[in-house]
């Protein structure tokens, strides 16, 4: 090796004519290997020796690669799964490509059809708009009422007398009485004042027309769109009854009743026994007789109804108070109160000595356990948490 060069490598004992050659040598594997040998205090080797060692190492690695371990079942399963996944990916890609091609073809074929459809729709819309312009914009109240009535008559549902008014499945019965019995037991449909009812069939027809024709609830006058909607409302709200509380509600169905028979007792009481003893009475005296009528026949407040017989009929809203059987208050004397207090002592539970002893034992064991725990916890000196302020570190 000549020593005339300016640039040298002490690890490989080489000289270079330029700095570029020196930099290229410093990046080579041969230089790195000689540096490691220098650290291990070994002499440097030549490039031929380094090349032979590299080729020998490559041959040994290839031999070791050939001598692999035997493939296990787990490894085989993993490889099979990987192969299946790759196949699935390929199939999905093929299917996606086919789908895109079909979509493109369908779009190309349907473009003229879409234009035709759009033209047809525009023509239909124009035809619909033309008759709308011809119709009158404003209608009077009478015309509107007539139109609504005609629509209701078209949508009318006739409910026969033998059919239930509230069942959605349209249950039929043999006669009206059986139908009314079913509605009373199943839905609570009760006809008030049946004693004075004259036209039962007319009342049922009126209720059926109110539900079937008007689609109106018989209690709250809720109006539904269809018969089914009204029936569902009445079943849900328990409005399957004839309202008979206010004066307007009674007047609504008054044409089906006749209460003239209820005044028979009053007329019989006022008629004289002997018709021969009639006397002419002036108008002033007749008016005074009317004023002397007992108040029981005329008095009727919002809570109780006073009948001519003297019976008082209560309102249904106060039914729970009428059902109460309250005993009258009895004021006891001092001696009677003392006797009652003495009698009630017998209802006290008897003194159980064994039960008291058992309770005392339980309390004793609880106190003993608590003392033992306190004693054990006091033995540990380092039982308090340590606090270290981080700012003072």
Curated annotation (Swiss-Prot):
Sites of Phosphothreonine modification: 140
GO biological process, one term: ribosomal large subunit biogenesis
Keywords carried by this UniProt record: Cytoplasm, Metal-binding, Phosphoprotein, Repeat, Ribosome biogenesis, Zinc, Zinc-finger
Region (Disordered): 55-82, 102-145, 268-293
GO cellular component: cytoplasm; preribosome, large subunit precursor
Subcellular location: Cytoplasm
PROSITE patterns per UniProt: ZINC_FINGER_C2H2_1
Disulfide bonds: none
Keyword Transmembrane annotated: no
Keyword Zinc-finger: yes
Domain of life of the organism encoding this protein: Eukaryota
Miscellaneous comment as given in the Swiss-Prot or TrEMBL entry: Present with 830 molecules/cell in log phase SD medium.
Family listed: Belongs to the REI1 family.
Function per UniProt: Pre-60S-associated factor involved in the cytoplasmic maturation of the 60S subunit. Involved in the dissociation and recycling of other late pre-60S factors like ARX1, TIF6 and ALB1 before newly synthesized large ribosomal subunits enter translation. Cooperates with the co-chaperone JJJ1 in the release of the nuclear-export factor ARX1. May act redundantly with REH1 to directly promote a stabilizing structural rearrangement in cytoplasmic 60S subunit maturation independent on ARX1 recycling.
Record's protein name: Cytoplasmic 60S subunit biogenesis factor REI1
Species of the source: Saccharomyces cerevisiae (strain ATCC 204508 / S288c) (Baker's yeast)
């Amino acid at each position: 090796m000549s020593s005339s060069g300016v640039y040298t490598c002490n690890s490989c004992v080489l000289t270079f004519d330029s700095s570029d050659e020196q930099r290229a040598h410093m990046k080579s594997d041969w230089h790195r290997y000689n540096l490691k040998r220098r650290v291990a205090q070994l002499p440097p080797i030549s490039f031929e020796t380094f090349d032979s060692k590299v080729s020998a190492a490559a041959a040994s690695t290839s031999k070791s690669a050939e001598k692999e371990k035997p493939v296990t079942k787990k490894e085989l399963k993993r490889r099979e799964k990987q192969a299946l996944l790759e196949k699935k990916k390929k199939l999905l890609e093929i299917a996606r490509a086919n789908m895109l091609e079909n979509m493109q073809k369908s779009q190309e074929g349907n473009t003229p059809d879409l234009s035709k459809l759009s033209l047809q729709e525009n023509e239909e819309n124009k035809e619909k708009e033309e008759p709308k312009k011809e119709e009158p914009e404003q209608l009077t109240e009478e015309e509107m009422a007539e139109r609504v009535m005609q629509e209701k008559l078209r949508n009318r549902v006739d409910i026969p007398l033998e059919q239930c008014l509230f069942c959605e499945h349209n249950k039929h019965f043999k006669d009206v009485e059986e139908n009314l019995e079913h509605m009373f037991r199943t839905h609570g449909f009760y006809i008030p004042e049946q004693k004075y009812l004259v036209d039962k069939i007319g009342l049922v027809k009126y209720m059926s027309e109110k539900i079937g024709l008007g689609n109106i609830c018989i209690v709250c006058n809720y109006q539904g769109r269809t018969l089914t909607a009204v029936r569902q409302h009445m079943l849900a709200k328990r409005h399957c009854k004839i309202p008979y509380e206010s004066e307007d509600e009674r007047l609504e169905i008054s044409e089906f009743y006749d209460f003239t028979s209820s005044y028979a007792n009053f007329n019989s009481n006022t008629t004289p026994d002997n018709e021969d003893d009639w006397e002419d009475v002036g108008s002033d005296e007749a008016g005074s007789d009317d004023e002397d009528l007992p108040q029981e026949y005329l008095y009727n407040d919002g809570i109780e109804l006073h009948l001519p017989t003297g019976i008082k009929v209560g309102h249904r809203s106060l039914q729970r108070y009428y059902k109460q059987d309250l005993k009258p208050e009895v004021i006891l004397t001092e001696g009677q109160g003392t006797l009652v207090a003495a009698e009630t002592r017998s209802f006290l539970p008897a003194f159980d000595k064994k039960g008291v002893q058992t309770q005392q034992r339980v309390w004793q064991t609880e106190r003993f356990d608590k003392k033992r725990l306190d004693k054990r916890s006091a033995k540990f000196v380092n039982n308090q948490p340590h606090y270290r302020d981080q700012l003072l570190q």
